[in-house]
A protein has these predicted regions:
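Conserved N-terminal subdomain of the carbohydrate kinase-like
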Residues: 1-58, 83
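Short low-complexity, flexible loop/linker segments enriched in glycine and/or proline
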Residues: 16-19, 100, 161
């Protein structure tokens, strides 16, 4: 926590509403908050701290000025560590699909791993299959694409092929944080096993743990 900083501005608020099946919808209060208005001087020097992995995503990668500040910093981080990117699309905040896609593609090009939901892919790339999008990203340099599909489970796609694990039947209370948990487990596996090991049976084991 020694890297934590204090701002006079309030924190962004995310107001969550749940439907009868536990699905979440969001309303965001972002104007005038510290979350999207900060200085590059706040960010740690990657050459000093030598990070193992950078996990980044959601609105801070698409809302200015934060997105540009973070992208410049992430380019420095990429010299030392792989980047895991989760678009976590929030079209209620930015409903301009072309701008959103441009922002996502910029981060994908910098990332080793992309974790994305089938809903996000459907909104970003209507008419394209998730496999087509994933293969295009991999051709561009991404090592692993993990696609979350809710109750249908997870798919991991690498240059070697696709690995699929089914969902686990549970009584859903709410879905908030489910995708974040998947991302955390993937990051843990990258640190423990190395990104190049996440293929075949090893990837299947990781995805199964994430699905549970």
């Amino acid at each position: 926590l020694d890297l934590a900083l204090v701002s006079d501005k309030p924190t962004c608020l995310a107001i969550v509403s749940l439907d009868e099946k536990g699905g979440a919808s969001y309303e965001f209060k972002i104007e005038g908050t510290a979350t999207f208005d900060f200085s590059s001087s706040w960010l740690p020097d990657p050459s000093r701290y030598k990070p193992q992995v950078l996990h980044i995503g959601t609105l801070v990668t698409v809302i200015e000025p934060a997105c540009d500040v973070l992208y410049d910093w992430a380019m420095q981080v990429a010299e030392f560590a792989p980047i895991v990117f989760d678009p976590n699309v929030r079209s209620v905040v930015l409903n301009d699909r072309d701008r959103y896609v441009a922002a996502v593609e910029r981060w994908v090009a910098l990332s080793s791993v992309v974790k994305v939901s089938d809903d996000d892919l459907a909104w970003l790339y209507p008419g394209e299959s998730y496999s087509e999008v994933a293969q295009r990203w991999i051709a561009g340099g991404v090592t692993l694409v993990v696609i979350t599909r809710g109750a249908a489970g997870l798919i991991g796609i690498t240059a070697e092929g696709a690995v699929e694990v089914p969902g686990v039947k549970v009584d859903v209370v709410d879905t908030v944080g489910a995708g974040d948990t998947v991302g955390a487990i993937v990051v843990e596996a990258m640190v423990e096993k190395g990104i190049l090991a996440l293929t075949g049976d090893t990837l299947k084991e990781v995805l199964h743990r994430a699905a549970v």
